[in-house]
Every structure is written in structure tokens, then in C-alpha cells.
Amino acid sequence: MDYFSMMVSLLLVAFHGAPETAASGTELSTGAENPGEKPPASAPWRPRRSKRCSCSSLMDKECVYFCHLDIIWVNTPGHIVPYGLGSPSRSKRSLKDLFPTRAAYHKNRCQCTSPHDKKCWNFCQAGTELRAQETMEKGRNNLKKGKDCSKLGKKCILQKLMQGRKIRRLEAISNSIKTSFHAAQLRAQLHREQKVTHNRTH
């Protein structure tokens, strides 16, 4: 009997001390009963953050600055922290289905939300070309800075030949990237034209 009276007194103190929680509990229960109701007008409406494109890596600061508009940037020691940078919206998942060639090509740096945004496509394409160009220039600089092989012998000459082959291979890769990008552009344009004519016929 002593245990029962102690429990009742604790419950009375708990409910008497927190009337706000009881009121909010009733509000929650009415909200659960009517899920179709809109929230009150006093609740602030948050607009959706606009993203021009979605970067594959947040470490690529140039891409993050370009793609994520309407973000407050705060400088911290070490790196820049973007506030309001969320996960990409679900609507972007269908981009691979709509434009398979461009999306497959641009997966290295970023993925544009709008297929008609030429600046975005050029930015993503220029990023891959610039990276290839940087690696080629780095290889050329290393080749120029190399040792004079006249006194060092066959091993040095072989190393220089291998570096020259690497540079030529990188140049061939960058040329193939450019040609594949132009081919992908033509395929995407053809796909869009076919889609438009298909929609007009039905």
C-alpha cells in the first residue's frame, strides 16, 4: 500500500509541474488524427535551396562554389564550411535516365540539374579538361627538370623515354575525352529532338 501511494504522489507532482507538456501532448494527438491539415500560418515557410548542379566531391571547392547557390559560406581555420548544403534532391536521380551520355561523361566532377544550362555543362566539361591539362603540364615540367643523361647512362635515358611515353598517352587521353564529349553532345541533341517529335505525334 505504501508503494502505491508513493507512485500516485509522484504522478501528481509530474503532471502538476508540467502543464505545458500535457497541452503539447494533446496538440500532437490532434495533429496525428488529422494528417491532411496544413500547419498554422504562423509557422515559417522555408524555401528550397537552389542548386545549379551536384558535385561529386565536396573537396572540389570551385565546383561547390559554382553549383550550390544561395549558401552562406563561413571561413574556418583549415577549410570553408558551407551551411545549408544538403543531400541532392530526389529529382536529380532521373537525370541519368534522361541524358545517359552526358550524365555518364560528367560523373567525374558534377552533374547539372538542367539540361539546358550551357554554362553548367561547359563548367563540368572544362573541369575534366583542365585536370588532364594540369597532369600533362606537370609531366612536361618534370621532364624538363630531369637530369642531364649524357653522364648518367642508359638507365636515365630509359626513364626519360618512359616519361615521354606517359605524356603522349595523357595527350591521347585528353584528345579522346574531347572527341567523346562532342559525340555525347550530338547524341544528347539527337535524343532531345527525337523526344520532341515523339511527343508531338502522340
From Swiss-Prot:
Disulfide bond positions: 53-67, 55-63
A GO CC annotation given for this chain: cytoplasm
Signal peptide: 1-23
Keyword Secreted: yes
Subcellular location, record wording: Secreted
Xref: InterPro entries: Endothelin, Endothelin_toxin_CS, Endothln-like_toxin
Single GO molecular function: hormone activity
A Pfam entry, by short name: Endothelin
Region feature (Disordered): 24-49
Annotated site location: Cleavage: 73-74
Keyword Secreted recorded: yes
Alphabetic keyword roster: Cleavage on pair of basic residues, Disulfide bond, Secreted, Signal, Vasoactive, Vasoconstrictor
Chain positions listed as propeptide in the UniProt record: 24-50, 74-202
PANTHER family: ENDOTHELIN, ENDOTHELIN-1
Assigned protein family: Belongs to the endothelin/sarafotoxin family.
Protein name according to UniProt: Endothelin-1
Organism: Oryctolagus cuniculus
